[in-house]
């Protein structure tokens, strides 16, 4: 947890140089349970929560414009599983995109979205902003590679939004909808991706 002014200033901006919003506190959880408890508490007390990753974006999406809690995903940085047979990766949001790309390449797989900041941006930010890059012309953008999301909702409930299959006709495309609308906009925190 950070409450000192120097730390708060570090988290008060992204790569948009002219935007600066100071949070009241910065929390850096290590588990989904910590996020769930934080979200439930903040929801009960009407405290705004802004999820943030590496803050390399240019849209202001990770800025705490209402103050409150900035919830950093930097400690949620594990690649949980690489399923070579089904060509699927399960990862936490704080994994650096280039690290993910290099790790799957070692297994003979390919993760195409390649934003210019891939050496420092987190996969969570890529999903939240639906990042692309030069390879998007041929291979598509991030939403084209998201099958399922684990999301901590504002009340602390933990849900999964989809299924770990490419063909899934059991209802709405919630992972795609979540990427397009971004759970950040409705107050959820994405904690795992497939």
Question: Where do the PLM segments sit?
Answer:
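N-terminal flexible segment immediately upstream of the FAD-binding catalytic core
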Residues: 1-40, 44, 57-87, 116, ...
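Residue-level detector of family-conserved "landmark" positions at structurally sensitive sites
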Residues: 3-4, 52, 100, 114
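Conserved phosphate-binding and hydrolysis motifs of nucleotide-dependent enzymes
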Residues: 31, 53, 125
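A short, small-residue-rich loop immediately preceding and capping a beta-strand
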Residues: 49-54, 110
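Ser/Thr-glycine-rich phosphate-binding loops at phosphate-binding pockets of nucleotides
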Residues: 53-56, 96
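FAD-binding subdomain of flavoenzyme oxidoreductases
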Residues: 78-82, 89-194
């Amino acid at each position: 947890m950070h409450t000192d002014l120097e730390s708060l200033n570090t988290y008060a901006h992204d790569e948009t140089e002219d935007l600066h919003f100071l949070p009241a506190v910065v929390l850096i959880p290590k588990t989904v349970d910590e996020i769930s408890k934080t979200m439930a508490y903040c929801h009960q007390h009407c405290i705004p929560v802004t999820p943030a990753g590496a803050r390399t974006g240019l849209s202001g999406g990770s800025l705490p414009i209402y103050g409150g809690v900035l919830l950093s995903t930097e400690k949620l940085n594990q690649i949980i599983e690489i399923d070579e047979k089904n060509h699927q990766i399960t990862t936490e949001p704080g994994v650096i995109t280039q690290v993910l790309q290099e790790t799957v390449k070692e297994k003979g797989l390919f993760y195409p979205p390649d934003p210019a900041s891939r050496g420092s941006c987190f996969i969570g930010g890529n999903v939240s902003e639906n990042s692309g890059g030069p390879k998007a012309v041929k291979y598509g953008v991030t939403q084209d590679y998201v099958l399922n999301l684990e999301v901590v909702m504002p009340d602390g409930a933990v849900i999964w939004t989809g299924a770990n299959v490419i063909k899934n006709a059991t209802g709405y495309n919630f992972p795609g909808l979540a990427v397009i609308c971004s759970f950040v906009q409705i107050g959820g925190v994405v904690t795992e991706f497939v």
